[in-house]
Amino acid sequence: MALVKEVLVVLNRLSPFELQESWDNSGLNVGSENSEFSEIVACLEITLKIALNAPQNALIITHHPLIFKPLKTLNDEIYPGNILKILIQKNVSVISMHTNFDKTHLNKHFAHALLEFDGLVEKGLMLVKENANIEFDALVKKIKSSLGVGSLACVKSSQTIKDLAFVCGSGASMFSSLKAQSCLITGDVKYHDAMIAQSLGISLIDATHYYSERGFALIVAEILHSFNYLVTIENFKNPLQII
């Protein structure tokens, strides 16, 4: 069996952990880097079902950190203690690739591979396409088609969009750096974000946190396959449903 630290070295080379935001907790979340692992599982999020199905001595690589904020208590009856208990009992290690991976891989996948936009410029966590000059309705139609969804929550502040900005996951707060006639495509848009953006003449399209990042596991699997690691992809449905 291989060691966790060997995979950490590969992942750090491709997406340095030092690139993560100061508030993030990417890296080894559970286990020891000197632990041996039996197989690798990649997933966007560690759900209770994924934890229960995880093989003994597995290494799980996840996008969202299981331990995000400092824990004052570890209660195995509530999240994340309920999942941590299962993982520890199975000797499962967990590596998180969060905002560092957003910057190096996932944002590009969201904007280019998934939504098919090119000519993108990096600006912090955002990718920006200047002088896109696209009609808002056509933009929404294109994104719905790319994501395979029938509806999207939007703020339409202008009919013609000059500049586009992309932030996978939860990036609605970043619209403040944009100019009027821009449109930010991201997830987790809140009511007050929408109100403020509208007052500034900035449009928003909520592509949802789930849909903007669901390609994570496949990207990681393809990367590790090139280093001769076999990876099992664990997918799950968006927990938020429109009924």
Swiss-Prot record:
> Where, by residue number, does a divalent metal cation 1 bind?
H63, D102, E213
Recorded effect of pH on activity: Optimum pH is about 4.0. Activity strongly decreases above this value.
Has UniProt tagged this entry with the keyword Metal-binding? yes
Q: Which UniProt keywords apply?
A: GTP-binding, Hydrolase, Metal-binding, Nucleotide-binding
- Write out the GO MF terms: GTP binding; GTP cyclohydrolase I activity; metal ion binding
What InterPro entries does this protein map onto? DUF34/NIF3, DUF34/NIF3_sf
User: Which parts of the sequence bind a divalent metal cation 2?
Assistant: H64, H209, E213
Q: Which reaction does it catalyse?
A: GTP + H2O = 7,8-dihydroneopterin 3'-triphosphate + formate + H(+)
Task: Return the EC number.
Answer: 3.5.4.16
Q: Which GO terms describe its cellular component?
A: cytoplasm
How temperature affects activity?
Answer: Optimum temperature is about 35 degrees Celsius. Activity strongly decreases above this value.
Question: Is Metal-binding one of the keywords?
Answer: yes
A Pfam family this chain is assigned to: DUF34_NIF3
Its pathway, per UniProt, is:
Cofactor biosynthesis; 7,8-dihydroneopterin triphosphate biosynthesis; 7,8-dihydroneopterin triphosphate from GTP: step 1/1
Family that this chain belongs to: Belongs to the GTP cyclohydrolase I type 2/NIF3 family.
Task: Summarize subunit and interaction data from the UniProt record for this chain.
Answer: Homohexamer.
User: What NCBIfam families does this protein map onto?
Assistant: YbgI_SA1388
* Function, in words: Converts GTP to dihydroneopterin triphosphate. Is not active with GDP, GMP, ATP, CTP or UTP as substrate.
What is the protein named?
Answer: GTP cyclohydrolase 1 type 2
Q: Which organism is it from?
A: Helicobacter pylori (strain ATCC 700392 / 26695)
